[in-house]
Structure formats: C-alpha cells, structure tokens
C-alpha cells in the first residue's frame, strides 16, 4: 500500500510521481522526513524515498513548501506511507514537459491518498490503478486537467477541492477539466467542490459504471459524457449516474457530446436531482460536437454518429442564463437518431430571450412534454 496524507499541491508546472510496482500493506518500520535543499528540493525528496522505499513512511512537514526545479520519478516503492502535510510547488512552466503523461502518476494497486496557463501540459494527476481511493486533497491553479483516471477499476475519488480560475479575461483557464475518466470501470466521484474552466466531469470512451454525486461545480462546462467518436473512432460508454449535484454559472449543465462520423454507443445514463444556476445550456445532447481547435475533425459525415439511448433526466431545476439558448437542446443525427429518452421534473427558470426547446432526431419526442 502507498498511503498519502494531507496533500496540498500548488500547481504551476510539473511534478511526476511514478509508482511502477504493485504494492501491498505492511507496517511502517522507518520514517524519513524530507529535508529542504538550497537549490532543488527534488534532490532531498528523492533521497527520502530511496531511504524509505520499503515498509517506510515519507513525511513532508506541515507549513513547509517544497520547491521543485526538476522532475521526480519515484519507483521501486513497496508498502510506503506518504504523509504530504506540506505544499509542493512545481517547476516553472516549461514546454519540454508537454509530452509527459502526467504531473503526478500513480500506477499500482491498493493506493490510498488521504487528507491531504500551459495548454499543452499534461494532467496534474494520472491514476492507473485498481481498488484505490483518493480523497481530501486540493489542487490549485492547474495548467490543464486536474485529474485523469485511465485503465483503472474500482476507484473512489472523494472530498477533493479543485480550484483553477483566472482574474484576467485574456488568459482563461481552458482545458482544465476537473476529472477525466477513460477506459475504466466502477468509478465513484463524490462530495467535492470544483472551480474549473472546462468539464466538471469528462466521461470518455471505454467507461462502464460511473457514479457522480454531491458535487458542486462553479464556472465549468458541466457534467459531461464525452466527447466521443472523434475522427470516426469507436467509443462505448454505459451505466452513468450523476445525482444530487450543482452547477453554478456553468457553460453547460448536463451534457452528452459526440463527434459527427463517430461510431459506438452511449446508453443507460441517468441525471437525477441536479441544480443548474444561471447556466447557458442546461440540458444538452449533441451528436454534432465540434472543437474549433481541431477543425479538421468537424467535417465528417454529419448524418451519423454514436447511438445514444436509454437516457433519463429527472428533477433538473434552476435557471438559464440570458444568452438565449434553449433549456433543452437534444440534437441527434438523422441516420442514428437518439431513442428511449425521458425528461421529468425539468423546472428551469427562463428569461424573455430563451429559445424554444429543441428535440431533433429523437425517437418518441412527441411523447415528451418538454419537446412539444
């Protein structure tokens, strides 16, 4: 087991923890307190992990900031507890890190972490693990996505605070998704507070059985499934539950987005008891998603995309912004229409400029009251 306690990361650039072994639980027999270094704290951090890499505890002292000038790669750890009571300050922006897989990479099994403007940057934390939990930590001012779960099973993320915002409208915190999930199953994300510049959740291809609950997200792009099917690729997502959560001032509220020309399916998706306050696009399902930063992928066959079915919106309340967008916008492809949708308890306060709801290429739309 690798156990992390009291993690407080002030993100300005790059840090990489790489755990490459499968780890088992054992009592700690040695404690190594990370010392400060006059030039680069990565040196003393590496030494502490080397000295306590088997059945040890590595301690980052409380009220201490550790400044890194280089990348850390920590491997060969067995049964290590990590008490991150201090703050890790990552290196200054450096484009040479743009191809790095993550700032912090946890790879292994039974990992437990507790109490704890570069748009080409990798995510801050990458999890590739099984039967692991990550909770009660903060990430502040991430340069890109805060956390990504990939090739994982049975992961719990809880009681986290992600805060990335900008006071300068010319430098918006783009691509700062809170939690990205891909090629994974049995994921729970709950009891967390987010301020981000992109998706509050991004549930991507190859994902099964995700539960998101009791999340407050501010200023983000909503609780999203996708994007999926980019460049004609095949993606499958099923069994998604998003409930008892809030989006404040978000661009989108609850959203499913697939690219034109994509293949695969989205099914068994439930949004339940969601509060959307001053949201531009409260309920949005589109098979015509386009990212202008990669416009070459926007020109595929717009009549087909992933099939989206068995999707249910229940008790979605709040208010729409003054931009004039519809409360409900379901816009599917003509040759792969959406089907088996229900919308009940939708109570979003409109403004005078709010457009009529859209339900295009949705089978059974005549039986859905918000579509008429």
From Swiss-Prot:
Any single biological process term in GO: cell wall organization
Q: Which SUPFAM superfamilies match?
A: Pectin lyase-like (SSF51126)
PTM note says: N-glycosylated.
Question: Ribonucleoprotein as a keyword?
Answer: no
Temperature influence on activity is noted as: Optimum temperature is 30 degrees Celsius.
List of glycosylated residues: 8, 63, 94, 130, 159, 209, 301, 331, 363
**Where, in residue numbers, are the PbH1 repeats?**
152-183, 184-205, 207-227, 237-258, 303-350
Q: Where in the cell is it found?
A: Secreted
* Family according to the record: Belongs to the glycosyl hydrolase 28 family.
What name does the UniProt record give this protein? Answer: Exopolygalacturonase rpg14
State the organism's lineage: Eukaryota, Fungi, Fungi incertae sedis, Mucoromycota, Mucoromycotina
- Gene (name only): rpg14
């Amino acid at each position: 087991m690798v156990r992390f306690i009291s993690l407080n990361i002030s993100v300005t650039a790059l840090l990489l923890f790489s755990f490459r072994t499968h780890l088992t639980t054992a009592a700690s027999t040695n404690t190594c307190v990370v010392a400060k270094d006059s030039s680069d704290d990565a040196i003393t951090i590496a030494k502490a992990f080397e000295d306590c890499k088997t059945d040890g505890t590595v301690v980052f002292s409380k009220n201490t900031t550790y400044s890194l000038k280089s990348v850390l790669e920590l491997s060969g750890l067995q049964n290590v507890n990590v008490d991150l009571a201090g703050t890790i300050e990552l290196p200054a922006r450096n484009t040479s890190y743009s191809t790095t897989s993550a700032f912090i990479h946890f790879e292994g099994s039974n990992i437990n972490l507790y109490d704890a403007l570069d748009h080409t940057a990798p995510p801050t934390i990458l999890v590739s693990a099984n039967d692991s939990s990550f909770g009660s930590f903060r990430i502040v001012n991430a340069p890109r996505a805060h956390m990504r779960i990939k090739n994982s099973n049975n992961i719990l993320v809880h009681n986290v605070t992600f805060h990335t915002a900008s006071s300068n409208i010319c430098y918006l915190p783009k691509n700062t998704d809170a939690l990205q999930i891909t090629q994974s199953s049995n994921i729970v994300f709950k009891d967390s507070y987010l301020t981000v510049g992109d998706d509050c959740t991004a549930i991507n291809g190859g994902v099964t059985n995700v539960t998101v609950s009791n999340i407050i997200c501010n200023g983000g792009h909503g609780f999203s499934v996708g994007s999926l099917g980019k460049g004609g690729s095949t993606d499958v997502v099923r069994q998604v539950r998003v409930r008892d959560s809030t989006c404040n001032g978000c661009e989108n509220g609850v959203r499913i987005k697939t690219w034109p020309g994509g293949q695969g399916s989205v099914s068994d998706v439930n949004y339940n008891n969601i509060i959307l306050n001053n949201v531009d696009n409260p309920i949005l399902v589109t098979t015509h998603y386009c990212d202008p930063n990669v416009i070459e992928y926007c020109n595929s066959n717009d009549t087909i995309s992933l099939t989206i079915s068995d999707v249910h919106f229940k008790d979605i309340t709040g208010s729409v912004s003054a931009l004039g967008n519809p409360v409900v916008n379901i816009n599917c492809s003509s040759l792969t229409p959406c089907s088996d949708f229900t919308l009940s308890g939708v109570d979003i306060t409109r403004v005078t400029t709010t457009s009529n709801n859209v339900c295009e290429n949705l089978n059974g739309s005549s039986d859905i009251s918000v579509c008429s």
